[in-house]
Amino acid sequence: LREFDRVSTDLVAAIEPNNAAVSVDSTVDSEVALEARVREAYLRGINTDVALGEQVKSLFGEVGIEPLSTRQYDHEKRTEPPYSEDALRSAKRKASGEGLADHETELRRGVDGETYDTLRRAWREMGREVIEQMQEESYERVETVPFTVTVGQVDSDAD
């Protein structure tokens, strides 16, 4: 933000996801709860503020940018028939556990070892259910990621 303040002569905008508030709805009953458990474990296992969007307005003020407006926009990622190649690949990664394996270090830091293995087994089972529903063309999933958009005015007379 300090760099925004330094290089801009007028308006700046910051668009930040609130990854702590991501929600999932799915036709696979276990997917919603498992997604939440995995997200919570991941967030405990990383050392990053994933909800920065809610703080941008005050952070603007701290560096001398006058906040003008803040709005939240929800981005929806839908999976429904006909399934894209990305959706099919995602289902395969769930069933194989590959998606969790990509973040195993962070997840293990967020849960104990036995819980990770239990979580991974449940995740793979859920992935197999996703594939079964996809074969029947009945699988639908909506992931909603809230984004905070903050616009501010740089004080160009401050130099």
Place the predicted regions along the sequence by residue.
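A short glycine-rich, Lys/Arg-flanked "PGG" loop and its adjoining helix->strand segment in the class I
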Residues: R2-A13
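Conserved Class I S-adenosyl-L-methionine
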Residues: E66-D159
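Conserved catalytic/acceptor-binding region of the Class I
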Residues: I15-K94
